[in-house]
């Protein structure tokens, strides 16, 4: 086992604080509408330019192992906030640094670190309760757009696009962000449930120009096994022909005699029909077929359930207003499923998302959830250069996460103002002087984001913070973008409560651990052995021409 270097007390804390400061100073320049960019060198390709706090934090790796430990713990604040709320990573880093700096001073002055931490926790809980009490629910599309705009660093076009996407696919719908091939940023919405399986034969096409099969007011047969035998299918086909409605067959595969007969019937015009393979594989295929069944109000024909294909009746089939099938995708719009059943299924999938530990499973469950909840929207981010597209995509991702958080828990005045106001409302009392000091640390630290935003804009933070606190209105604050004071909510300068709350809780949690650290252990750097000399016996090589 390699030898270790151990540092104690003040020496350890100073090293750790240095690491915290290096990381936080690199991240906090990006905060606010007038925040600056950070350029990150990449081992291949062009450097990356970003204003995304967590992207900057993830790149900071320090040479000194003790400093690096401090930086890594603060990085954890940004990552955790990003995972939970999707935005607010810079705010969390600024808060973390402020609490650690104040706490380190108090510990150096001889206060008990454990009591300080208890005081910090008391104050943070009170601030969180205050924020949730002040939260304003958002209802209109304009309010969603405002949140998106603020999070995208003031780009109104992005805010508007996110609001439009949310309106189309609902708050639960999936909105993905991709890099566009063009310079334009655009929004594409797929309504209904779409899965990546196309028609099994081009003969099913009803619109030869677009090469798609459109079925209006169709019946849907869901079968989990292969269909190759025509006899078993005949009763269903005859029942559907009587209704003169189209039929879509979704099965593991349709082949041989069954497929040939379906194609011949389609070509003769006796039966409007199309067949596609079921989406997914294995257990996931079963689950997705069940999703389609619930969405369309049908049943999955499965031998596990004791249902034979020959005994299928019309009421076991799903229904949908419209089905559109291309070479690659099938889209089912307006299924006839019961809302209560769909909601129950959505709840079940949400439960699975919470319980799963695999990122891959979580992603697949999110996709299923979106398809059930009403659609998928894709925002394609364009730009003149690759570097610009990547930077813009970071901002769109942040804005999207912030708007989701805002819809979930509501909004408060932005620009760090909500925390600034909360600092004057802390009434918690500690049981001793050290806990009181912990409460005061939070009082001072939660002013840091507002101060940093104004500092980044080149303004005098103390003057502006003083002026905001003089006014008694909860929503009065400073608009850094144009240098004016006013009612921030009506100006559209808002922050999602979930983002502010998560940032503060994570910052306090990690800062509390840093303050209470008394020893640090790291591996000693290995001493390099002296390079070996040239081996002997290489003489006598004269006269050789190289």
From Swiss-Prot:
<keyword id="KW-0963">Cytoplasm</keyword>
<dbReference type="Pfam" id="PF00118">
    <property type="entry name" value="Cpn60_TCP1"/>
</dbReference>
<dbReference type="GO" id="GO:0005524">
    <property type="term" value="F:ATP binding"/>
</dbReference>
<dbReference type="InterPro" id="IPR002423">
    <property type="entry name" value="Cpn60/GroEL/TCP-1"/>
</dbReference>
<comment type="subunit">
    <text>Forms a cylinder of 14 subunits composed of two heptameric rings stacked back-to-back. Interacts with the co-chaperonin GroES.</text>
</comment>
<keyword id="KW-0143">Chaperone</keyword>
<dbReference type="GO" id="GO:0140662">
    <property type="term" value="F:ATP-dependent protein folding chaperone"/>
</dbReference>
<feature type="binding site">
    <location>
        <position position="415"/>
    </location>
    <ligand>
        <name>ATP</name>
    </ligand>
</feature>
<dbReference type="InterPro" id="IPR027409">
    <property type="entry name" value="GroEL-like_apical_dom_sf"/>
</dbReference>
<feature type="binding site">
    <location>
        <begin position="30"/>
        <end position="33"/>
    </location>
    <ligand>
        <name>ATP</name>
    </ligand>
</feature>
<dbReference type="GO" id="GO:0005737">
    <property type="term" value="C:cytoplasm"/>
</dbReference>
<feature type="binding site">
    <location>
        <position position="51"/>
    </location>
    <ligand>
        <name>ATP</name>
    </ligand>
</feature>
<feature type="binding site">
    <location>
        <position position="495"/>
    </location>
    <ligand>
        <name>ATP</name>
    </ligand>
</feature>
<dbReference type="GO" id="GO:0042026">
    <property type="term" value="P:protein refolding"/>
</dbReference>
<dbReference type="InterPro" id="IPR027410">
    <property type="entry name" value="TCP-1-like_intermed_sf"/>
</dbReference>
<comment type="function">
    <text>Together with its co-chaperonin GroES, plays an essential role in assisting protein folding. The GroEL-GroES system forms a nano-cage that allows encapsulation of the non-native substrate proteins and provides a physical environment optimized to promote and accelerate protein folding.</text>
</comment>
<comment type="similarity">
    <text>Belongs to the chaperonin (HSP60) family.</text>
</comment>
<keyword id="KW-0413">Isomerase</keyword>
<dbReference type="InterPro" id="IPR018370">
    <property type="entry name" value="Chaperonin_Cpn60_CS"/>
</dbReference>
<protein>
    <recommendedName>
        <fullName>Chaperonin GroEL</fullName>
        <ecNumber>5.6.1.7</ecNumber>
    </recommendedName>
</protein>
<dbReference type="GO" id="GO:0051082">
    <property type="term" value="F:unfolded protein binding"/>
</dbReference>
<feature type="binding site">
    <location>
        <begin position="87"/>
        <end position="91"/>
    </location>
    <ligand>
        <name>ATP</name>
    </ligand>
</feature>
<keyword id="KW-0547">Nucleotide-binding</keyword>
<keyword id="KW-0067">ATP-binding</keyword>
<dbReference type="InterPro" id="IPR027413">
    <property type="entry name" value="GROEL-like_equatorial_sf"/>
</dbReference>
<dbReference type="GO" id="GO:0016853">
    <property type="term" value="F:isomerase activity"/>
</dbReference>
<dbReference type="InterPro" id="IPR001844">
    <property type="entry name" value="Cpn60/GroEL"/>
</dbReference>
